[in-house]
Amino acid sequence: MSQESIGKVILLQPADASAKTTDVVEGIISGIMETGEVNVVGLNEAMFLACSAINMSTEIAKVYVDDIDIASLLMPNLGKVAVISAHLSQKQAGDYAALAEKEDKALTDPSEQTISVSRASTMERLLTICLLRLAKFDEVKVVAAGGSINDAITLALKLIGGQISKDPLGIKLFHLHSIIMRNDPTKSIAAVSIYLQKGVTTRYTKRQSELLKKLESGI
């Protein structure tokens, strides 16, 4: 786990995937107390760790997610990687839960438009299911929890990459949240809902664009 400086960036590499969530949370809290803001970036296998640490931080401290995105980057020494990048601060800039609820209400056939990602399904199978649903609907929702988050993000990035989807496709909303664990109602786990829509261009804020460029240049 390395901490670089473009503002404060906690960069979680694939090799960090087995690190303790609380160790990352400690870094987030420290960064927030120092400067009032921190960027958390997870690469490939470490994306779930990043999501878990972000969620825990917002649950135990006055910390809010004001910007969160996923992207596919070409990075030195790592090649093509899937990335999740979030900017955390102490100011609540928007209500992602309300935006997700609005998107859910707009779905015409929620059960058909929702693709649940699990480790039991191959990426090829998931891609095929998504393409079948996109042939019927303009919008689909990809959901996952726990370690399947890595696959869900990879799936979404493959779909918006332009190589396999028949229609131009973009990310309308990325929602990171928590759900109660089925086998232990006293515990929660990170989960994501990724809303993909035809004709939408995936947009990044200026801050995220600059950070992603620096990641590609090997900050």
Regions found by a protein language model. Give the residues of each.
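Long, charged, low-complexity intrinsically disordered regions
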Residues: 2-138, 150-219
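Conserved strand-helix element at the start of the C-terminal RecA-like helicase core
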Residues: 146
